[in-house]
Amino acid sequence: MSVSALHNDASKKGAIILCGGKSSRMGRDKATLPFGPELMLQRVVRLLSEEVDSSAIVVVSAMGQILPPLPPEIRVACDENPGRGPLEGLAAGLKAMPDHVEAVYATSCDVPLMATSFVRAMFDHLGEHEIAVPVEGQFHHPLAAVYRPRILTVVQQLLAANKLRPRFLFDEVPTIEVDVESLRVFDPTLSTLMNLNHPEDYEKALEQLENRS
């Protein structure tokens, strides 16, 4: 599918939201943190629903994790091997992805200030590649990247070989690296890349939300 066609056809786009992390630095489950009138995971689901097929949004949770109420079409998968990094969650999400989806945006649940224009731009950058990933110097952002569902087999092979770093995946399949500075036109503060790991990050994000209103 061409870039322009994918841009205009949300039905071919899906999303994976990883929310099974321990949240030890935050001190509580980030998925259920209040953020405005919603909880954190609910907000991220709603924002992504503006850009992708909502029936192709997969929330990847930990075993036994209690999630906030979500729209009935949202899919939930379980990370059966916790503590092995984002590739494990990515594999769980891709396995649960509907067959009609051609590209998937992967994110964590703790990015409530996500800019949907950033997400759209990452889909546009994918082109004929298997992955489009933002890069900041030498650092890749695997949880703000777009993946073709067909890479699942490669992800599973890497996991079986205990190659858990996303960089191994980027080296294995055709990947386009997108300089984060070029994405500021869509997200001037790059808030889509701002994870809330500590209570002070959460408080700062709440202040930013209030300033937007």
Language model features with spans:
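N-terminal donor/sugar-recognition subdomains of glycan-related enzymes
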Residues: V3, H198
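Nucleotide and nucleotide-moiety/phosphate-recognizing core
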Residues: L6-K163, D171-L190, E203-R212
